[in-house]
């Protein structure tokens, strides 16, 4: 009896197991997608609305006014310096053109930088007080100041009164007053010369000596922050340019290699100010002539 050997069974193919993702992961992805879609939708809508509102305001021609009533428009900054046309009214010239014409022979220096003037330096003369400075120094000073650095004289005159023009009688009175002032000055100089020529008595001599022994000192705030003590006339005048009258008139009228075409006195007169208070000597010189 024969035995039947069963044939081996064929191997079954491996079964593929599909694992479904958990529900939480699916919900997270869906929420992120909706979040980004909503965010970008709102962002683009806002940009579109802002563009439309701005275009509408520009189309209707008007500056955008703030909806906040408490927000006031900012006032324009006030310029603390001097006007450019007033600065240009002061003449500029090289120091070499007036160096040999000065009445004094001691050196001049700029009160701002404290440097002595050289021949190639360009100077600017303040015709109100005849203090002279380097053009760069004084122009930089006038950007934030309206006064002379030495004597502190205000170079920005007050606004003229409205609808007031000097009459002919007032002009005649001004001319007569200037002439009388000149005569009084000449008379005062003559009296002073007579008193100097007269020899004082012993009591007067002692009093004069006491007065001469008193030092003439005074402090003043300097432009660089320190104080100056003046004792000698040379120290008092080292910032002042003293010239002969014909040279002074030529410089103040802007004919000696200057950039300005209008003098300070003409500028003040055109604007309706009383230029006699600013120490301009050109009008007095013409009245003497």
From Swiss-Prot:
Transmembrane segments: 25-45
Basic and acidic residues bias (residue ranges): 208-219
Membrane topology designation: Single-pass membrane protein
Catalysed reactions, as listed in the record: S-ubiquitinyl-[E2 ubiquitin-conjugating enzyme]-L-cysteine + [acceptor protein]-L-lysine = [E2 ubiquitin-conjugating enzyme]-L-cysteine + N(6)-ubiquitinyl-[acceptor protein]-L-lysine
Subcellular location(s) of the protein: Membrane
Keyword Metal-binding appears in the UniProt entry: yes
Region (Disordered) residue spans: 179-237
Biased composition (Polar residues): 191-207
Top EC class for this record: transferase
GO cellular component terms, A-Z: membrane
InterPro entries with a match to the protein in the record: RING-H2_zinc_finger, Znf_RING, Znf_RING/FYVE/PHD
GO biological process per UniProt: protein ubiquitination
EC number(s) stated in the UniProt entry for this protein: 2.3.2.27
GO terms, molecular function: transferase activity; zinc ion binding
Domain of life per record: Eukaryota
Pathway assignment: Protein modification; protein ubiquitination
Keywords from the UniProt entry: Membrane, Metal-binding, Transferase, Transmembrane, Transmembrane helix, Ubl conjugation pathway, Zinc, Zinc-finger
Zn-finger segments (RING-type): 110-152
PROSITE patterns assigned to the protein according to its UniProt record, in alphabetical order: ZF_RING_2 (PS50089)
Family of this protein: Belongs to the RING-type zinc finger family. ATL subfamily.
The record's note on its domains: The RING-type zinc finger domain mediates binding to an E2 ubiquitin-conjugating enzyme.
The protein's name: RING-H2 finger protein ATL29
Organism: Arabidopsis thaliana
Lineage: Eukaryota, Viridiplantae, Streptophyta, Embryophyta, Tracheophyta
Gene: ATL29
């Amino acid at each position: 009896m024969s035995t039947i050997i069963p044939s081996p069974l064929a191997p079954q193919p491996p079964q593929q197991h599909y694992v479904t993702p958990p529900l939480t992961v699916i919900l997270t992805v869906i929420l992120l997608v909706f979040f980004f879609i909503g965010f970008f939708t709102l962002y683009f809508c806002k940009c579109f609305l802002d563009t439309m509102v701005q275009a509408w305001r520009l189309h209707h021609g008007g500056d955008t006014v703030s909806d906040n009533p408490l927000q006031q428009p900012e006032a324009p900054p006030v310029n603390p310096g001097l006007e450019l046309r007033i600065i240009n009214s002061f003449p500029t010239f090289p120091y070499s053109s007036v160096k040999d014409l000065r009445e004094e022979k001691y050196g001049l220096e700029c009160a701002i930088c404290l440097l002595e003037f050289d021949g190639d330096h360009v100077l600017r003369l303040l015709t109100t007080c005849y203090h002279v400075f380097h053009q760069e120094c004084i122009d930089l000073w006038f950007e934030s100041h309206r006064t002379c650095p030495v004597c502190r004289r205000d170079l920005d005159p007050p606004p003229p009164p409205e609808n007031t023009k000097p009459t002919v009688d007032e002009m005649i009175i001004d001319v007569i007053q200037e002439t009388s002032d000149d005569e009084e000055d000449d008379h005062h100089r003559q009296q002073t010369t007579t008193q100097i020529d007269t020899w004082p008595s012993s009591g007067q001599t002692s009093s004069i000596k006491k007065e001469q022994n008193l030092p003439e000192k005074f402090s003043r705030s300097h432009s660089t922050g320190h104080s100056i003590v003046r004792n000698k006339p040379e120290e008092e005048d080292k910032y002042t340019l003293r010239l002969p009258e014909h040279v002074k008139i030529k410089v103040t009228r802007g004919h000696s290699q200057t950039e300005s075409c209008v003098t300070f006195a003409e500028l003040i007169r055109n604007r309706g100010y009383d230029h006699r208070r600013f120490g301009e000597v050109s009008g007095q010189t013409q009245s003497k002539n």
